[in-house]
Amino acid sequence: MVLVTLLGLSWFCSPLAALVLDFNNIKSSADVQGAGKGSLCASDRDCSEGKFCLAFHDERSFCATCRRVRRRCQRSAVCCPGTVCVNDVCTAVEDTRPVMDRNTDGQDGAYAEGTTKWPAEENRPQGKPSTKKSQSSKGQEGESCLRTSDCGPGLCCARHFWTKICKPVLREGQVCSRRGHKDTAQAPEIFQRCDCGPGLTCRSQVTSNRQHSRLRVCQRI
């Protein structure tokens, strides 16, 4: 009789025990999923320190762990404490302070929210230096140049091998090159001369027998 009673109780309790185990498994899975995503949120203010409100297109927003230095970001709230979002990258505050201090004078709240942007001058690529010089800073003979306006009086900017330097304008009797003449083929010059000075022209030198030589010199017009 006792054996029959025990068998009956075990048969009755087995489904109940299985139901309790299934409920515990479901609860544990939900806890793990909730712990992985964090609590639901509507904005960053709903999350605790060190977290931000992360939103996906097809899921509800939840609190996610903040991102460390050199991680991608869309706003400063995404970055961990002590860092800010600069040019879409989490950056330590001490690395941005010189630029921020220099550009926030007289601009209250310029870096308060959103992504911190570097000034346009900081991001602008370094190009060629300005060639506008005052008269006192004009290039002297032998100094590098880009154009004749970079050189001082009586000088021109001419090619010297694979660079350009300031050279003296040619005087009367000096050998010259007649550049831009269509009748003769011109090869690339790696050693250019300046043009003849004012009142002079580059012409073939006349020899004693009044024949034109191949040598050209600066002569009076």
From Swiss-Prot:
Q: Where is this region: Disordered?
A: 101-143
- Subcellular location(s) per record: Secreted
Q: Which GO terms describe its biological process?
A: negative regulation of hair follicle placode formation; negative regulation of Wnt signaling pathway; Wnt signaling pathway
Q: What is known of its domains?
A: The C-terminal cysteine-rich domain mediates interaction with LRP5 and LRP6.
This protein's name: Dickkopf-related protein 4
In this chain, the stretch annotated as DKK-type Cys-1 covers 41-90
Question: What PANTHER family does the entry give?
Answer: DICKKOPF-RELATED PROTEIN 4, DICKKOPF3-LIKE 3
Subunit structure, as described in the record: Interacts with LRP5 and LRP6.
Disulfide linkages recorded for this protein, renumbered to the chain, are C145-C157, C151-C166, C156-C194, C176-C202, C196-C218
Q: Please classify the protein's predominant subcellular localization into one broad category.
A: secreted
Ranges of biased composition (kind: Polar residues): 128-139
Function of the protein: Antagonizes canonical Wnt signaling by inhibiting LRP5/6 interaction with Wnt and by forming a ternary complex with the transmembrane protein KREMEN that promotes internalization of LRP5/6. DKKs play an important role in vertebrate development, where they locally inhibit Wnt regulated processes such as antero-posterior axial patterning, limb development, somitogenesis and eye formation. In the adult, Dkks are implicated in bone formation and bone disease, cancer and Alzheimer disease.
Q: What is the lineage of its organism?
A: Eukaryota, Metazoa, Chordata, Craniata, Vertebrata
A Pfam family reported for this protein in Swiss-Prot or TrEMBL: DIKK1-2-4_C-subdom1
Native organism is: Mus musculus
Location of region: DKK-type Cys-2: 145-218
Q: Which key words are in the record?
A: Developmental protein, Disulfide bond, Secreted, Signal, Wnt signaling pathway
Signal sequence segment: 1-18
Instruction: Please tell me one Gene Ontology term that the record gives under cellular component.
Output: extracellular region
